Amino acid sequence: MNKPISSGLRTTFLVHFILGLIFGLLLLLIPESFLGMFGWNVAQPATYRLVGAAILGFTASSWFGYKAANWDQVRIVVLAELVWAPLATVVNLWGIIRADFPPIAWINVLIFGGFTVAFWILYNQHEAEAAAMSPAAKAPAPKVPARKAARRKRARH
């Protein structure tokens, strides 16, 4: 199944790469300054640096996905995004509602929520197209000659 990657998926990978690179580097290198601009209390900068490193890891996988040619090469990356992005969305929502996340966290909800929707739609689209291209989907059902079918039917009764 060497189904090419759609332009929509390639664009999603590129946007994810760019945003991830920006936010990941800022969190990794200057979490206090970056988050402090938005009123985010950074008591433990090492924790935010770790989040920045994780974001950069997913950013690298999006770059590899952007450069890949086939669905088979990026399927696992999209599945990982379908775990990461919804979890990040829920954690940010929880932080806004139950914890002390500042209002700027709504941007995180929108970004991660947007990636959740985009990767979900593109995953389903590519899986459906890959299934339609599979040899099993293309192969016609084997034909049984009419006489053999009649004999089989009589033998069962």
Task: Write out the residue ranges for each language-model feature.
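Membrane-helix boundary elements
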Residues: 8-12, 20-46
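Membrane-helix boundary connector in multi-pass membrane proteins
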Residues: 90-107, 124
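Membrane-water interface at the C-terminal end of transmembrane alpha helices
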Residues: 114-134
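Non-cytosolic membrane-interface motifs at loop->transmembrane helix junctions
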Residues: 38-46, 75-77, 100-111
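Short, highly charged, low-complexity non-transmembrane loops/tails of multi-pass membrane proteins
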Residues: 130-151
